[in-house]
């Protein structure tokens, strides 16, 4: 009996070893967390079906109360029986997967045992199904509660299921004397082994789940700590200063060799190993980062070639690169670099992904705050324009001069002046206005400018009829037209033309303002609309403000597009088309 116990212990060890290997595979861990889904049940049937066949074919032949052999068996003689771990695999399949998994595994195991043959082989098919129903019942209770049986409960169920098998052998046998001899020899070792094996199997599962929970807790703590310390920086936007401050904190708190943050084009910061050639303010040099920006998906590299850095002395051997999003559009990347590619773990990847999600949310919140601030700035500038001494007195002086010459025209200009002030104030208080109202604002502004400088410039409109009700951010066209008048023509007093073109391009509204002025110097063209410039006629801050509002509201696809030559300048943008009629309809429905 002791020999049988040791041989059975070896068989259980094989099953436990396979279980341990499976529980260290991520796919199996995911499957175990989704046991109530049929996809997972089907996979559990396959796995435990294979386990049950291994248990059958690695059994120990028993004849007349003695061990004959422990070899792998395909067929037994008619008087021989077998001691194996079949009940263990059926019982555990039921405790983990529930009744349907256990019943199908039980049928597979029973048919396999029937195929091997021996004395009363059909008995084992019956016992397999009975054991499956009982273990499946207990498993179903725990699946409903999203838990697992305790180790103690599993051990008791394991012993009970083996006792049931012994009962089936005695109940359904054709040779009671043979059955009693067999049960008296194998019962105690198999009951102990089955109980012990079930307990160990559940211990592996429960300990793995506990480790996963502890790892998640540590990851959550790390993510929250990092998020808490980097929170103030990403709220200010994705720029060089905020990126460097955040990267310094990440490098200090994480076990990585280097941290880098980029936008879609340039490296904003790189701190740690490889900083001699991964330099801020330069274009992205790694192929891996470009792939992430293109695909919008997390990428992991375990070799220098996978990173795609072409510097011959680059010390970086591994990397995790995660995209940063703003309003569902890739805005940049967060990169963790390693000089030892063997230490890149799944937890590092999950941590990087979690941080990227939090940083993306902070960037979106920061941008929303920036939009609110920009709108406030626009309102302040609008109010300032109303009391601006130069603009106000120039307009009043022009009207005063016209009162004696052409009182009717002076009256019309006063109306236009009041219209201009009113439109400025109303526009600053709204995120969008109709194109029609924007054009009225432009007309009011131009009438005052043309009164001061008669015949100095001509303006032409090409507006699609279907665009009149389109909603656009206020001051777009006015700022572009005003920019042309102030900067395009210098001291030229005639043959100055401005063309305003508004049309539909698929689902976008295309707005273009073109002049035939002197053009923008080539050294300033790339910075116009992004940074202020030094000029005797202004700083270009209005275009910077406008560009920020456009990209903040609609994304980078709506950024200002500036083309210039010696024959003139064209400033254009694309805005997602939305009709004021549609908005009014939606508001009326929601009331």
From Swiss-Prot:
Main location: membrane
A cellular-component GO term for this protein: plasma membrane
EC number: 2.7.13.3
GO terms under biological process: cell wall organization
Membrane topology: Multi-pass membrane protein
Pfam families referenced in this protein's UniProt entry, alphabetically: 5TM-5TMR_LYT, HATPase_c, His_kinase
Residue span, Histidine kinase domain: 363-579
Keywords: ATP-binding, Cell membrane, Kinase, Membrane, Nucleotide-binding, Phosphoprotein, Transferase, Transmembrane, Transmembrane helix, Two-component regulatory system
Compartments, as annotated in UniProt: Cell membrane
Catalytic reaction annotation: ATP + protein L-histidine = ADP + protein N-phospho-L-histidine
Described function: Member of the two-component regulatory system LytR/LytS that probably regulates genes involved in cell wall metabolism.
Name the UniProt record assigns to this protein: Sensor protein LytS
Native organism: Staphylococcus epidermidis (strain ATCC 35984 / DSM 28319 / BCRC 17069 / CCUG 31568 / BM 3577 / RP62A)
């Amino acid at each position: 009996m002791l020999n049988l116990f040791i041989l059975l212990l070896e068989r259980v060890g094989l099953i436990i070893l396979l279980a341990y290997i499976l529980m260290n595979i991520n796919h199996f861990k995911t499957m175990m967390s989704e046991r109530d889904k049929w996809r997972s049940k089907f996979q559990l049937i396959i796995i435990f079906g294979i386990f049950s066949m291994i248990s059958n074919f690695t059994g120990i032949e028993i004849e007349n109360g003695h061990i004959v052999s422990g070899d792998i068996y395909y067929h037994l003689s008619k008087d021989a029986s077998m001691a194996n771990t079949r009940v263990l695999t059926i019982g555990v399949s039921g405790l983990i997967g529930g009744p349907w998994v256990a019943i199908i595994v039980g049928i597979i195991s029973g048919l396999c045992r029937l195929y091997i043959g021996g004395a009363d082989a059909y008995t084992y098919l019956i016992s397999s199904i009975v054991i499956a129903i009982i273990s499946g019942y207990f498993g179903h209770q725990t699946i409903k509660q999203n838990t697992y049986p305790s180790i103690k409960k599993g051990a008791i169920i394991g012993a009970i299921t083996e006792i049931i098998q012994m009962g089936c052998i005695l109940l359904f046998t054709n040779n009671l004397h043979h059955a009693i001899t067999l049960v008296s020899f194998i019962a105690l070792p198999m009951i102990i082994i089955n109980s012990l094996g079930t307990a160990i199997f559940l211990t592996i599962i429960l300990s793995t789940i506990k480790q996963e929970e502890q790892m998640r807790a540590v990851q959550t703590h790390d993510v929250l700590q990092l998020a808490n310390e980097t929170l103030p920086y990403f709220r200010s936007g994705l720029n060089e200063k905020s990126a460097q401050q955040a990267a310094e904190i990440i490098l200090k708190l994480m076990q990585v060799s280097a941290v880098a943050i980029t936008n879609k084009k340039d490296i904003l910061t790189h701190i740690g190993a490889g900083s001699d050639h991964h330099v801020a303010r330069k274009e992205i040099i790694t192929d891996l980062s470009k792939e992430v920006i293109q695909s919008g998906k997390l990428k992991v590299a375990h070799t220098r070639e996978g990173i795609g850095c072409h510097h011959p002395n680059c010390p970086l051997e591994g990397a995790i690169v995660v995209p940063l999003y703003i309003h569902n559009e890739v805005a940049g990347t967060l990169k963790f670099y390693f000089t030892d590619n063997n230490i890149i773990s799944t937890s590092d990847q999950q941590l990087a992904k979690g941080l990227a999600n939090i940083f993306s949310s902070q960037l979106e919140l920061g941008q929303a705050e920036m939009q609110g601030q920009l709108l406030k700035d626009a309102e302040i500038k609008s109010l300032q324009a109303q009391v601006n001494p130069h603009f106000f007195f120039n307009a009043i002086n022009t009207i005063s001069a016209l009162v004696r010459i052409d009182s009717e025209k002076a009256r019309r200009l006063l109306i236009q002046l009041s219209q201009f002030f009113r439109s400025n104030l109303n526009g600053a208080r709204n995120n969008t206005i109709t194109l029609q109202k924007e054009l009225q604002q432009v007309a009011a502004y131009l009438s005052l400018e043309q009164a001061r400088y008669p015949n100095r410039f001509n303006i032409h409109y090409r507006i699609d009829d279907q665009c009149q009700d389109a909603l656009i951010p206020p001051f777009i066209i006015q700022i572009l037209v005003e920019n042309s008048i102030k900067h395009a023509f210098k001291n030229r007093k005639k043959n100055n033309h401005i063309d305003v073109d508004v049309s539909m391009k698929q689902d976008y509204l295309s707005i273009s303002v073109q002049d035939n002025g002197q053009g923008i110097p080539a050294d300033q063209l790339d910075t116009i609309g992004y940074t202020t410039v030094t000029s005797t006629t202004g700083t270009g801050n209005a275009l910077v403000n406008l560009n920020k509002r456009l990209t903040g509201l609609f994304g980078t696809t709506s950024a200002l597009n500036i083309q210039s030559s010696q024959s003139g300048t064209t400033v254009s943008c694309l805005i997602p088309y939305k009709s004021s009629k549609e908005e009014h309809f939606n508001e009326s429905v929601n009331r």
